[in-house]
């Protein structure tokens, strides 16, 4: 009986020890104690109960303490519960301290929660980053297209990381400045001879306003001559003018054809009237003879005139026919 009780007691002790080491990270507490970081066992147990991974808070706290940064465990735990990256924030604080960059924990935590990489921002403040823009096509006043590529050296502005625009805004503004500068040049050769004029003009516009960066320099890495857009536009305009002129000429031709048909119709109408009038002549002669307005001699004289006229008309037609036949031969 005593043996069974002893076994039960030993088993209970083993279960208790297992649960204790499962709940309480003793190894982490020993590491913190060795690093002169005062953390109680109950604090670690409380983290477990609050579903906080103790190592995600204690290890950054050890690094901060060793680096001489005074930050409380409550702030680190609160930042972890807010969804922040505690380790990255502490690394950023250490890097800022080594580089003599003023950066408080609250500021670093706010930057991290805003979705920015605060450690990368601190590193970029020490070691500026070079942003390479895509090829920007611009057209000078003489119609020649120039294709330029720029390299922008920027340094992170920690004070404007929250709410400041990112790299894409810098790239867009630099591209706009290049297009404006090249477009204002009278001759594309001026730009090719002096490409640093683009850098000076673009840099003087304060393109970093409202962004999370400070532009240190803008350098034109490459510039090439593209298409002759002016000549192409003139060619297209000439082709368009040609088509318009052809359309107008076709319209005038159609109007002329329609007018010709109208005149032919009018000629036929006049001929019909002549025929109609000629049909009335015998009636008029008969009426004149009945009424005694003309005599028989006058009538025969009129017939002779008509016959003479017809004969002359026939002779003229025959002479025209002979002339045309001789021309064909």
From Swiss-Prot:
Source organism, top-level taxon: Bacteria
Matching InterPro entries: FloA
Major location (coarse): membrane
GO cellular component: membrane raft; plasma membrane
Spans through the membrane: 4-24, 26-46
Regions annotated as coiled coil: none
Pfam family, one: FloA
Membrane topology listed for this record: Multi-pass membrane protein
Record localization: Cell membrane; Membrane raft
Keywords annotated in UniProt: Cell membrane, Membrane, Transmembrane, Transmembrane helix
Keyword Transmembrane helix: yes
Matches recorded under NCBIfam families: PRK13665.1
Protein function: Found in functional membrane microdomains (FMM) that may be equivalent to eukaryotic membrane rafts. FMMs are highly dynamic and increase in number as cells age. Flotillins are thought to be important factors in membrane fluidity.
Family per similarity comment: Belongs to the flotillin-like FloA family.
Subunit-level organization: Homooligomerizes.
Record protein name field: Flotillin-like protein FloA
Top-level taxonomy: Bacteria, Bacillati, Bacillota, Clostridia, Eubacteriales
Gene name, Swiss-Prot/TrEMBL: floA
């Amino acid at each position: 009986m005593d043996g069974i009780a002893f076994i039960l007691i030993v088993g209970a002790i083993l279960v208790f020890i297992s649960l204790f080491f499962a709940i309480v990270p003793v190894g982490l507490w020993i590491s913190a104690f060795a690093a002169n970081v005062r953390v109680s066992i109950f604090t670690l147990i409380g983290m477990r109960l609050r579903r906080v991974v103790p190592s995600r808070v204690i290890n950054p706290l050890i690094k901060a303490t060793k680096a001489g940064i005074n930050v409380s465990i409550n702030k680190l735990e609160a930042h972890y519960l807010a969804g922040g990256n505690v380790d990255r924030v502490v690394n950023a604080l250490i890097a800022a301290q080594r580089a003599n960059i003023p950066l408080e924990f609250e500021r670093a935590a706010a930057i991290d929660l805003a979705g920015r990489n605060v450690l990368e921002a601190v590193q970029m403040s020490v070691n500026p980053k070079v942003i390479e823009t895509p090829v920007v096509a611009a057209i000078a006043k003489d119609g020649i297209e120039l294709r330029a590529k720029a390299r922008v050296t920027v340094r992170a502005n920690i004070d404007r990381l929250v709410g400041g625009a990112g790299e894409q805004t810098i790239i867009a503004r630099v591209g706009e400045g290049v297009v404006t500068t090249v477009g204002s040049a009278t001759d594309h050769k001026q730009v090719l001879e002096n490409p640093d004029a683009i850098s000076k003009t673009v840099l003087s516009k304060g393109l970093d306003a409202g962004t999370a960066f400070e532009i240190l320099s803008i350098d034109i890495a490459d510039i090439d001559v593209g298409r002759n857009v002016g000549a192409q536009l003139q060619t297209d305009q000439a082709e368009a003018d040609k088509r318009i002129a052809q359309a107008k000429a076709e319209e005038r031709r159609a109007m002329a054809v329609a007018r010709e048909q109208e005149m032919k119709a009018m000629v036929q109408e006049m001929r019909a009237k002549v025929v109609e009038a000629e049909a009335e002549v015998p009636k008029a002669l008969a009426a004149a003879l009945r009424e005694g307005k003309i005599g028989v001699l006058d009538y025969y004289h009129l017939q002779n005139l008509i016959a003479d006229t017809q004969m002359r008309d026939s002779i003229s037609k025959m002479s025209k026919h002979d002339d045309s036949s001789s021309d064909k031969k």
